[in-house]
Curated annotation (Swiss-Prot):
This is D-aminoacyl-tRNA deacylase. SUPFAM superfamilies: DTD-like. Belongs to the DTD family. The gene is dtd. A motif (Gly-cisPro motif, important for rejection of L-amino acids) lies at residues 141-142. It comes from the Bacteria. It is an enzyme of class 3 (hydrolase).
Length: 163
């Protein structure tokens, strides 16, 4: 599971259709998280990503140090599904998306990640799965972090959230 985490002071996601645009998620501050799921991802990957999102210390404390977590500051998450995080553009000019999970699996783990974040006491807004969306945000810092749960499987130093 891959997540691009962007610290924001405000963000929204609109669904675009032939009938126009509709805002389906909006937050005042916290993280915009673009979430991609691959074939081998399971609930353990969702737990790892949700735990990291909830506890990453990238918000300033009283001394200006990045020492506070999303939970500490009462921030929100705008969670947006993003299968293109598994694009392979190594050859040719058209990326392959064969590493992205099938829609049913991806949706299940995407929704599970949202519920896990809510279980941490975090307010979560979401995009709409399998739709054309436009994400608007004001990136703060900027702070942008890439998580890949696969790294927990290949690096013995990485801490994995217990079952």
């Amino acid at each position: 599971m891959r997540a691009v985490i962007q610290k924001t002071v405000g963000a929204k996601v609109d669904v675009v259709s032939e009938n126009g645009t509709e805002t389906c998620g909006k937050i005042d501050g916290g993280f915009v998280v673009l979430l991609g799921v691959t074939h081998s991802d399971i609930e353990k990957d969702a737990r790892y990503v949700a735990d990291k999102i909830a506890h990453l210390r990238v918000f300033e404390d009283g001394e200006g140090k990045l020492n506070l977590s999303l939970k500490d500051v009462g921030g929100s998450v705008l969670l947006v599904s993003q299968f293109t995080l598994y694009a392979d553009a190594a050859s040719g000019r058209r990326p392959s998306f064969s590493k992205a999970a099938p829609a049913e699996q991806a949706k299940r783990l995407y929704l599970h990640t949202a519920e896990l974040l809510r279980g941490h006491g975090i307010h979560v807004e979401t995009g709409r799965f399998r739709t054309h969306m436009q994400v608007s945000l004001c990136n703060d810092g900027p702070v942008t972090i890439l998580l890949d749960s696969f790294m927990t499987r290949i690096s013995p130093k990485m801490k994995v959230v217990p079952d």
